[in-house]
Amino acid sequence: MTRSPFRRLVFGTLRRLLYLWVRSETINQSSFTLNLDRSRPVFYALQSPSISDLAVIDTECRKAGLPRPVLSVAVGNLIEPSAYFYLTPAPDWLGRQDKRGAPPTLERLVAAVSQNPGEDAQIIPVSVFWGQSPDHESSAWKLLFADSWAVTGRLRRLVSILILGRKTRVQFSAPIHMRELVDQNKGHELTLRMSQRLLRTHFRNLKSAVIGPDVSHRRTVVKGLLDEPLVKQAIIEEAERENITQEKARERALSYGNEIASDYTYSVIRFMEVVLSWFWNKIYDGIKVSHIEGVQEIAPGHEVIYVPCHRSHIDYLLLSYLLFRNGLTPPHIAAGINLNMPVVGSLLRRGGAFFMRRTFKGSPLYTAVFTEYLHTLFTKGFPVEYFVEGGRSRTGRMLQPKTGMLAITLRSFLRNSRMPIVFIPVYIGYERVLEGRTYLGELRGATKKKESIFDIFKVIGALKQRFGQVSVNFGEPIRLAEFLDGEQPDWREQELAPQFRPDWLSETTHRLGERVAQHLNEAAAVNPMNLVAITLLSTQKLALDDQAMERVLDLYLTLLRAVPYSPHTTLPEGNGRSLIEHVKGMDLLAEQKDALGKILYLNEQNAVLMTYYRNNVLHIFALPSLLASFFQSSSRMSREQILRYTHALYPYLQSELFIRWPLSELDEVVDQWLAAFVEQGLLRFRNDAYVRPEPSSREFVLLTLLSRAIAQTLQRFYMAIALLLNSGPNTLNPEELEDLCTVMAQRLSILHGLNAPEFFDKSLFRHFIQTLLDLRVLRKDRAGKLSYHPMLGELAEGAAKRVLPAEIRLSIRQVALHSNEEEQNAGNESGAA
């Protein structure tokens, strides 16, 4: 095509005409990030003949300063008139393709590199996507012309250009070095076939990652579910149980399938992209994305399950938007059935949502249909998204994982593990969450309302506020096969029946949920709101001198940079002063001036709201805050003492906050933090002991503020222990202890003026009690009453003395004693009645 100047002129004219309409871009700037050896010739491999694709690739190469595919190139003595070839040859006039032969250019390349030991050629696979969508059998007319798995003809491509040409994406992939293949010394024919196979596999995996696997239309999928053995058996059992005909039970199963299944539609995805592009840049100050390149590398050839944290209803839309913008297939998203409302439900369904009921109890047929639907998605390799927390976090903490979807995923993988499953944790951090005021009411004790996507529209009146930036961090992937190898090494040899439910499933699913939560927290995006919140909420009056605030924030930034929480954690740019100005610009930080300077403070409403943003990063501050707490009641401690008390308390903090380090790594991390404290003057190391600064020093004030970040958590631990010890063994069951803890915490919050409703969150006490049971510090007798190990007393009188001031411990013990007396009096009155 480029052998003569005339043909080059024709090609250039066609390209310019094409770009009167077409707009193209590379996926994730892939044309600019190629690791090319500029001294070696470059060739471009295209999957199939297309003059329009070649024109787009040539344009993107010119933009990126890459060698152009339409110009000649030399490999040793071989001179090729152009630097591209098609892996699949053009069809003849009857539409037939001979896929057995190799591209002539590739054949000559293999020969040239083989004959010249000093030569190499770099082959860059390039794909052009005219719109992105999974293949449907029937759908909106625009979707008919989007890239799919169907064979594309000239007329279809022309219409695709007209309809979708303004959203054209190009993926340049890592180069294949021909020298590496030739040096395997397999001979000309084998090397040629190996090159073709590598390219075919690459194009297939890339297409699956970008436009989704070859998935049939929704109606076909739903009807296909009814023929699966698991669902057929459930239909028979439903008919017998409900005393109805099998045909009636089959119709019921079909209705369940239609209720559940998504109706993925490209036109809706494209519409959402346009709307959301406006939204993220109008309401928010854009989106900051980190570590998505790891997802782009792992997506081809894997069943990807995205497991984001859940902070807002717009989480549903955010991840799909980002994936689409970065050249990855938007996932099928598990959504609560409450969102399946008129108009909104249809829009979400066409955007990839599939709907699930809050509980499957009492409906085995529904369970079978839902389970089989997910199994179909997993085995076809279609990306899926679900929230392991279940609902949105109202407190800003990572909620305890709900293991239902994880269990379904595990059982599906045990049935069919040919498609490797990888979980991708996604941390979504808002500087200001849209539903913040709604959460504020619930934090203050208002009854939790039923979730509805219309919660978003309730905040429209507040959109004049500044909402800051959204951060999305992709965490370390969890490969399910590797996880199971560590938990159950013989899992591959076990039964693979659809209803197989091994004895170890529950415990393994629980540990998988914990692993996901830990990886989510590892990917936390620390923002200015988080750091200002954790600083001011650690002061007694929720206020701090402007200069002192700047020093604290600078210290926190320095410490977090010195001892990174994880490679996937991100920190804000700038210094303490820039963080203060940023939060002030969002009207969440009040200021009062006097003759001595400026005081920054939180009003009552914002103080409660800021607990949400503090809790986002509490897991990052937990360990350094615990270490700082030791020096509030002790002026000096040896390393051995610090490690002993840290090991005593750490398991409870780790369990509640999903902290990443196992006990085996704890000593090393503690040493890193102690070294950072010494470096910043928060501690001194003298005579084999760590010594705190003078109580009147600035450094001691900083150390004290840091210690208070985790103070309320430690106080809750001590409350439960004090109530248990005062009650005596075999007196309370877990529910009674939980209720007493909640009442006691409410009392203490009034007595000490704590404006943090989560301080008496019943679920936190419930989890702490369960952790004590898991660690065998507590035991249940036959009547369900709690007895305790002697180490509980040691925990209260040893470790607690090190981390809680004497007045706090005394106050807790007094309230605990009073609570126990009231409980006993109530019991006596009940007995007398």
UniProtKB/Swiss-Prot annotation:
It comes from Pseudomonas syringae pv. tomato (strain ATCC BAA-871 / DC3000). GO terms for biological process: CDP-diacylglycerol biosynthetic process; fatty acid metabolic process. The lineage of its organism: Bacteria, Pseudomonadati, Pseudomonadota, Gammaproteobacteria, Pseudomonadales. This is Glycerol-3-phosphate acyltransferase. It is a peripheral membrane protein. GO terms for molecular function: glycerol-3-phosphate O-acyltransferase activity. It catalyses: sn-glycerol 3-phosphate + an acyl-CoA = a 1-acyl-sn-glycero-3-phosphate + CoA. A motif (HXXXXD motif) lies at residues 310-315. Its EC number is 2.3.1.15. One of its GO terms (cellular component) is plasma membrane. Signal peptide: none annotated. Pfam families: Acyltransferase (PF01553), GPAT_C (PF19277).
